């Protein structure tokens, strides 16, 4: 599967403007989004991942139509959504949109699902409350299946919970993390450990200001990053291919054989108590029978 990660800038001023009911909907901002999406389409990527808080909610229908037309999936952070309420403080949500295209009876469609951020970062919650708003917390995580690709989505600070980030071991072929985070060293350690502990691909996308956007595989230090990027003034994408079937085939082998075969030079062995039955069910397309 060909994955593209966006390398683009997030602005703190855009967050402030949302809270002031003066959102930035400039042509320049739209053109940057358009350039990224068009680049992904030209490169025929299967999935494009954008950072946390990136996409204005009002532009989602346009993006959904583009996904349907080109059969390209997109995972993107949605700019903070402020909902004004009568006689109550406005409610502010941090959403991640998962847009999955499909074809039904020769017609092209796309499905949008929203993940509500479960754990808001302390400074994020503080800023929301400083504008006399209330932060909305989610209460669940989702496991997605699209074209036999099983993945879950986490939004930045959620990854700091050991319990939350470990719940999809063996089930998820990949963990996708959308971020707006300057503590890249801390999150780098989390992602590298997560990739090995869950034995899956990790796709992390952060603002280009802080960087460390990457695709990481459960491998040794020298080869763990398929791509990694920071900085740059222009909005662009970087892409690489993840071998989902190859990783599953490796996971199904015993620990001793994993270390001996040639793929053992590419992947680290699976951790103790890894659920091989789940991988087998994915290979036989029967995992739907056991997930809730």
Task: Indicate residue ranges for each PLM-predicted region.
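Active-site-proximal beta-strand elements of phosphoester/diester hydrolases
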Residues: 1-22, 114-116, 149-158, 176-178
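Cysteine/selenocysteine-centered motifs that mediate thiol-based redox chemistry or coordinate metal-sulfur cofactors
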Residues: 143-157, 254-292
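Active-site catalytic loop in hydrolytic enzyme cores
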Residues: 87-170, 189-190
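Short, compositionally biased "basic patch" segments
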Residues: 1-22, 29, 124-144, 220, ...
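Short, surface-exposed connector motifs at secondary-structure boundaries
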Residues: 42-48, 145-149, 170-175
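Short catalytic-loop micro-motif centered on adjacent basic/acidic residues
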Residues: 48-52, 151-154, 175-177, 203
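Cys-nucleophile CN-hydrolase/nitrilase-fold catalytic domain and related Cys-dependent amidase chemistry
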Residues: 22-115, 181-183, 190-192, 196
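CN hydrolase (nitrilase-like) catalytic-core segments centered on the catalytic cysteine
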Residues: 62-75, 159-266
